[in-house]
Amino acid sequence: MTKLDPYFGEYGGMYVPQILMPALKQLETAFVEAQEDEAFKTEFNDLLKNYAGRPTALTLTRNLSPNPLVKIYLKREDLLHGGAHKTNQVLGQALLAKRMGKKEIIAETGAGQHGVATALACALLDLKCKVYMGAKDVERQSPNVFRMKLMGAEVIPVTSGSSTLKDACNEAMRDWSGSYDKAHYLLGTAAGPHPFPTIVREFQRMIGAETKKQILEREGRLPDAVIACVGGGSNAIGMFADFIDEESVKLIGVEPAGLGIDTPMHGAPLKHGKTGIFFGMKAPLMQDREGQIEESYSISAGLDFPSVGPQHAHLAATGRATYESATDDEALEAFQLLARSEGIIPALESAHALAYAVKMAKAATQETILVVNLSGRGDKDIFTVADILEERERSQTGQQKEESGND
């Protein structure tokens, strides 16, 4: 028996080998006790305030909105120490690990942001740190790999499968099954087996709680919609959690449409997946006709995940949240637009949410307040974007030469 409900409607659960059940139950017990312990909460809040830099700003954009009727606010998780929302829940889980007497942390990472956050928390709290990362992601996120190593983490490239986030998740889980007596698996998103989706949501919910307080101070009312990108779904559930009971506020998650939803090159399981079992949970999954897990794709490594957290699946099924998608090209355009119009370089992940917000703003016919969760900063993505833009410029120049040669 679990102390907390392991399901969100039909989604969630604990689909893990029997060997991991004691570890998950120990984690759940520690979490429930910590939530009732004032000393734990005080230490966590102190770290968030005096180490990570909370509360983060809620910034009203000056030039981003294409429509005078629409105000677009950004919740500035990019300003958090570590550069993304990941730091919030990592500090919470690292404190939990210490509470359980663990000496070592195992983690997985895609874009490297969760790895960096884990490495900084381990350095701060004197824990050994091991990070599994898909070999492809190691290549495309070299600045973050160096950051992790600089802070004392061991980064292990994963070459199995598609060499991306899902394979890193599998390897991390495999390692944990043989070492949970001394190690804690610090999962990086609101997915996986219970109690991880609940733990991650609770350690991220200050995003929405702060946003609610800040927007009421600024506008005297709640926003019409809050918008966040969705890979596994931790930044989005952190933003949504405090608004779920506010029926007037639309909750909008934006999945990566990659090269297009009508192609196999996307990462949008909520809209285009089938329910299956993966990574210890029942959730929407990108699967082929044989039920095998398909490779997901996104320009942003942090959204390149073939499934999604169970609470998002439940929010979609009940209609409380809607899930849209943005293509690579739309995210790239939004990435450049925010940089040019506001002097803020967003993570490519966050740019998916921005792209959809701008689209919503264009279509609005009445006064509207939108809040976008700017989940991370884009330093890690500048080389990826530069390469793509240079390549496009070259092919455009080549095309123009070809056309002028045909005149």
Swiss-Prot record:
**Top enzyme category:** lyase
Q: Which GO terms describe its molecular function?
A: tryptophan synthase activity
Q: Which GO terms describe its cellular component?
A: cytoplasm
Give the catalysed reaction(s), semicolon-separated. (1S,2R)-1-C-(indol-3-yl)glycerol 3-phosphate + L-serine = D-glyceraldehyde 3-phosphate + L-tryptophan + H2O
Pathway annotation: Amino-acid biosynthesis; L-tryptophan biosynthesis; L-tryptophan from chorismate: step 5/5
Give EC number(s), comma-separated: 4.2.1.20
What function does this protein fulfil? The beta subunit is responsible for the synthesis of L-tryptophan from indole and L-serine.
Q: What is this protein called?
A: Tryptophan synthase beta chain
Organism encoding this protein: Shewanella woodyi (strain ATCC 51908 / MS32)
